[in-house]
Amino acid sequence: MRVLNDTISKVINYKFTDYAILEEALTHPSVNKRNSEDQVVSYERLEFLGDSVLNMVVSVMLFKMFPEEKEGALAKRKTDLVCGSTIANVAKEIELGNFIIMNNSERCNGGKCNLKNLENSLEALIGAIYIDGGLESVEKFIIRHWEKLAKDILDPPQDPKTSLQEWTQRNKLPLPKYELVKQTGPAHNPEFTISVCIESYDKVSACAPSKKIAEQKAAELILEKIKKTT
């Protein structure tokens, strides 16, 4: 684990003092590892913590970067910066998949490239840095990777679900209806298929590792259909 710490520290520019917390942050649930108290060791608990830490640090960062913007605009920026796809892209940028510890089955099924695994492990790593080094250390890591993303967003982004809802309201149509079509895959790596339906258009479906992302993808697909017919 010391070798892993030395290697990953060069990538994330942070060196852990607690090797155990680093190992926990990088351990996929498929390993089914247990500690001396027979408790499962995986990145899931740290993922929960890291999600909250990321949201807080990004919120403060945006508050300082855009002093003239109202709450709604800041919220849209934050939603875009902390969504699953953005987190996964940052994880890919630092090649975090190379460090995730998983069983052979998960690895053979592309687990090291799986976007949900990348998202979860990066959130866990953020949680681990917070526990090991405190708020200042984790702020440096997050700002190093997210500040440039925030600067690239010239205007507050509009998510597809909001855009679709506003389109239906402008055209005096009923609001979009989203429905869970099916859920597949194991509990630690699920895949959700969500459909969306609006009046005068055929139902459209999309798949993603979370219901929220699947809804956004479905909304984006139906917006593309609307653009082609108007």
Swiss-Prot record:
Top-level taxon: Bacteria
Family annotation (SMART domains): DSRM (SM00358), RIBOc (SM00535)
Subcellular location: Cytoplasm
Known cofactor(s): Mg(2+)
GO biological process: mRNA processing; regulation of gene expression; rRNA processing; tRNA processing
GO molecular function per UniProt: double-stranded RNA binding; metal ion binding; ribonuclease III activity; rRNA binding
Domain RNase III: 5-134
Organism: Wolbachia pipientis subsp. Culex pipiens (strain wPip)
Stored InterPro entries: dsRBD_dom, RNase_III, RNase_III_dom, RNase_III_sf
Stretches of the chain forming a coiled coil according to its record: none
Catalytic site: 51, 123
Stored HAMAP family: RNase_III
UniProt catalytic activity: Endonucleolytic cleavage to 5'-phosphomonoester
Binding positions for Mg(2+) per the UniProt entry: 47, 120, 123
Entry GO CC: cytoplasm
Domain DRBM, chain residue ranges per copy: 159-228
Entry EC number(s): 3.1.26.3
Protein name as it appears in the record: Ribonuclease 3
Similarity annotation: Belongs to the ribonuclease III family.
Assembly, per entry: Homodimer.
Pfam families: dsrm, Ribonucleas_3_3
Keywords recorded for this protein, A-Z: Cytoplasm, Endonuclease, Hydrolase, Magnesium, Metal-binding, mRNA processing, Nuclease, RNA-binding, rRNA processing, rRNA-binding, tRNA processing
Signal sequence, start to end: none
Functional summary from the UniProt entry: Digests double-stranded RNA. Involved in the processing of primary rRNA transcript to yield the immediate precursors to the large and small rRNAs (23S and 16S). Processes some mRNAs, and tRNAs when they are encoded in the rRNA operon. Processes pre-crRNA and tracrRNA of type II CRISPR loci if present in the organism.
